[in-house]
Each structure stands twice: as structure tokens, then as C-alpha cells.
Amino acid sequence: DRDSCVDKSQCGKYGYYGQCDECCKKAGERVGTCVYYKCKCNP
């Protein structure tokens, strides 16, 4: 689920991050981006 994406992600401060995006898509979200080094999934 989307919370596991956040836990796993070590990404840049801002912007697109492939691993985060993949995880979010598997969780049924539209896209994943990074905000302050955390993955955020957007519906």
C-alpha cells in the first residue's frame, strides 16, 4: 500500500523518482513524487 512506498523510499528532495512511482502504481495510485525525501503517492 501507499504507506509502504513512503517507508521504502530514499529519494531526492523534490521531483519524480522512478522507484517511488512504480510502488505507487502497484498500490493503485496514479503517480509518485518526492517531497522532502519522502515518497508521496497521488491518487
From Swiss-Prot:
The keyword Secreted applies. It comes from Centruroides noxius. This is Potassium channel toxin gamma-KTx 4.11. Pfam families: Toxin_17 (PF08086). Belongs to the ergtoxin family. Gamma-KTx 4 subfamily. One of its GO terms (cellular component) is extracellular region. Coiled coil: none annotated. Reversibly blocks Kv11/ERG potassium channels. Its main location: secreted. Keywords: Disulfide bond, Ion channel impairing toxin, Knottin, Neurotoxin, Potassium channel impairing toxin, Secreted, Toxin, Voltage-gated potassium channel impairing toxin. The keyword Disulfide bond applies. Expressed by the venom gland.
